[in-house]
């Protein structure tokens, strides 16, 4: 059997591994931190930019404010309380008007919860059915929230205080995110 026109498929060229020898730029490090934060909370670029701009205007550490604001979003609070298995599922519960904050219907997932807010599920059969298939998300409830998921009654959550750095268990350097957006000002 000769070599003919068909190429020998057993041979292939080994590509040189340039990624190991190439130095990662500071821009790349900042972009990765920003993307990790963005995808973890399911935000668009514009939403995250809005939170960074709010953080710049506040007093205190600019890097710590965006994670605090993101942790206090209604969709994230519902996820952390265990009422939804994922943040997108929590967003859907809010959008479909299944959630009450202080006994008022809130259908905006980006609603910023405040301390002493009481989050409950509407007293409708469809609202209760929406939660039946959900399993507790994230394991333990953070210390800035209190959950009561007792059988027979509606699931209820209470926001005790504003989230702090310890309750946000992300391995992200928030200052890198702020530095990334310092170019966009």
Swiss-Prot record:
Recorded coiled-coil stretches: none
GO process terms (BP): ribosomal small subunit biogenesis; translation
CC terms in the record's Gene Ontology section: chloroplast; small ribosomal subunit
Domain S4 RNA-binding: 72-134
UniProt KW keywords: Chloroplast, Plastid, Ribonucleoprotein, Ribosomal protein, RNA-binding, rRNA-binding
Main location: plastid
Domain of life: Eukaryota
Gene Ontology MF terms in the entry: rRNA binding; structural constituent of ribosome
Subcellular location: Plastid, Chloroplast
PROSITE patterns named in the record: RIBOSOMAL_S4 (PS00632), S4 (PS50889)
Annotated region (Disordered), positions in chain: 132-154
SMART domains: Ribosomal_S4 (SM01390), S4 (SM00363)
Function summary: One of the primary rRNA binding proteins, it binds directly to 16S rRNA where it nucleates assembly of the body of the 30S subunit.
NCBIfam families assigned: PRK05327.1
The family this protein is said to belong to: Belongs to the universal ribosomal protein uS4 family.
Subunit field text: Part of the 30S ribosomal subunit. Contacts protein S5. The interaction surface between S4 and S5 is involved in control of translational fidelity.
Protein name: Small ribosomal subunit protein uS4c
Organism whose genome encodes this protein: Woodwardia unigemmata
